[in-house]
């Protein structure tokens, strides 16, 4: 929790000069403030907290592949809340992806007793982290037509830092010596998380979201789990099980069908939210 706090606290500080230079141009409507706070709570506080807590309990391979369900949640939530179009093939893909997620989460292994409760709970937390991210993106979408991507990014960083300050303080008082254990390599890692993983990544996502739909914006994140899986095997020495491969194939096909369907092929199978 302390790492999350430091990450977004320093990211907020880095963005402070921009806000100071643009403060006369930035006019926030009072009615939008609760929405911006909600984006920060869902997209940062809940998303990252749930993901890291889940990662403590499960493998990096399972966590990375389960995060691939994010585009499928984007399809459902984008259709339901933003009235984005959805087709029959999308629903079929979501169903396949859901089955794949159940396999990786460990539903079959529960009945055979080959998965621990801790790992199962960790996998559930990873799924909840994806849902939290999509909810944040759904709330942010209409706000990006009013405010610049950098403004939205800066505000949610501040929200993330504030909401993580209390658990970070508790963690520090329980183990005040942890800061003395930070190495030079650790400082480089924190700098990377602040400048690239936080400021650059969140800004580019919010900017991309302002130019396209929630579905398309989240679609590009499906490359990440496959890269993470390869690194987990090479660096962490984790093993890929047969059930993981089966679930991963189902999710990959599900994401493809759920998000990459061509309008001209499926125009007769269109669904609309009433």
Model features per residue range: what roles?
Residues 40-45, 49, 71-76, 131-134, ...:
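Hydrophobic/small/kink-forming positions within alpha-helical transmembrane segments
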Residues 15, 37, 86-109, 130, ...:
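Hydrophobic transmembrane alpha-helices of multi-pass small-molecule transport proteins
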Residues 1-2, 34, 61, 87, ...:
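Residues that define the loop-to-transmembrane-helix transition and helix capping
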Residues 9-14, 66-80, 95, 159-163, ...:
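Alpha-helical transmembrane segments of compact multi-pass small-molecule transporters, enriched
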Residues 3, 7, 54, 80-82, ...:
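Hydrophobic/aromatic residues within transmembrane alpha-helices
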Residues 20-67, 103, 194-212:
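Specific transmembrane alpha-helical segments of multi-pass solute transporters/efflux pumps
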